[in-house]
Amino acid sequence: MSSSEVASHYNKVLQVGIEGRKESRIFFMRNMNNWVKSQLINDAKQRVNDNGVNNPRVLDLACGKGGDLKKWDIAGAKDVVMADVADVSIQQAEERYKQMFGYKKNNIFTVQFIVADCTKENLEDRIENKDPFDLVSCQFALHYSFVDEASARIFLKNAVGMLKPGGVFIGTLPDADRIVWSMRNGENGQFANEVCKITYENVEELAEGKVPLFGAKFHFSLDEQVNCPEFLAYFPLVKHLLEELDMELLFVHNFAEAINKWLEPGRRLLESMTGLETYPNEKLSGKSDDEYLEAKAKLDAFPEDERIKTMGTLSKSEWEAICMYLVFGFRKKKSEAEKTEEEPATTKPVAESESEQKEVTESEEKEDQEDCEHQEAQTN
């Protein structure tokens, strides 16, 4: 699948109103995905602060419709470059920024919007300000470049080529190992539940264990959204290619691990973003009681005198779909001379205030849900 076909797919995705999104079968899953992304950006923000930078220069690669613009504002960004292959998505991102600018006047970061195929073009040639980036983010999009080795290498070079030593590269992408395991254990090379269906194009290739490192095409349909072919990106391979570009791994977690890691510090924001469904209630999103067996068991396990009436949860199908993704963080290596010259940095507290939480929550409701990147368009 060519980059022009990917662009055409995302350009055709229709925007859905807030009320319409609330009726979606994956409403809570989308909110949870956005919460995970918020926590990931918050983690990166702290690491950048620890590197002595309080107002980072940011590259938002495969930015889609600009769903993270408010997040960059809250992160204190001074300058952001937003690049995407889909021209309609970039137009919508520009409109979002104009709305933010009108509200905040001059108290906002500057932005350059670029329509570019980052699997073929040298993005640096298109960027006006040649200063290096402190932070690069690529959400639910990196794996599209793994159509072939050349495309993947160019995309990753664009991602980290202008990243300063000590700078951070974060992202989310489908967990190739988990997806392959799920398809192999399904019927006819596919996995399906109430909210998603994943199929591998070459069933014989899958059955024989001959899935290639590049060009391994699969289809991920989510909540009856338009299906755009994608490519598996094995994380050990992603890590290897980035290490060739002087990057070092900071962390990698599947979404289940990430949620457990960030749950306590981010609980209030998760509640504000409606990332969990209240169980039991009269209008559960799942179609059967089987979707909530674990939640029911946990409630029933409480002693009679301590029993609570409700709890927050996700349906079984939403949880299975969420577990198909992972988050990662890399850092650009510093030279020995740079390490020697370093002095302790004065860091800025990273915890979000209540007002910041309210702002990002309102942003997620009004805008980011249109932009859960791969999840949203099929989620930015």
UniProtKB/Swiss-Prot annotation:
Q: Name one GO molecular function term.
A: RNA binding
Compartmental location: Nucleus
Please verify whether the record's keywords include Methyltransferase: yes
Q: Which residues form the mRNA cap 0 methyltransferase domain?
A: 24-333
Q: What class of enzyme is it?
A: transferase
Q: Where is this region: Disordered?
A: 336-380
Question: This protein is called what?
Answer: mRNA cap guanine-N(7) methyltransferase
Source species, please?
Caenorhabditis elegans
